[in-house]
């Protein structure tokens, strides 16, 4: 999987979101059909559900494209055998740009730890869970489905920051609320 996934960067560079996320998915999906790939697993995001930002919109367009291509193959409108399935993730802990390394670095520097809003919540999963979802979708999918991993209850980001500060043993670290960024939601949806 390759995509731009950072909301602020895509808000500032919408044309790159289209070029990389949408055009990149379209080219790879079309090549999968052309060369007879049996299964195509697209990695999407919870931000594609009722999208409020460029990145979420770009991933929703990708979801629609691969589902449409899958249906066109089933209907005989496109010649091919590729089955297209989609996985939809929340935030993957430990991935590039994850909040955990950011908070660790901010704590190490003595703070402040920056959180956009006191009520912001996010779903999280671990890298092995994300890998498992992709593999399961590739194995179980028959084409056209969107697979969503049960990520449990969403986590309040301020609670995560407070826990990390407490576990660090460092006293007096301030949590600073910076305000929601352009396109950012207070909460994400998975369905």
Over which residues does each language-model region extend?
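A conserved pocket-lining segment of Rossmann-fold NAD(P)-dependent short-chain dehydrogenase/reductase
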Residues: 102-125, 129-153, 157, 177
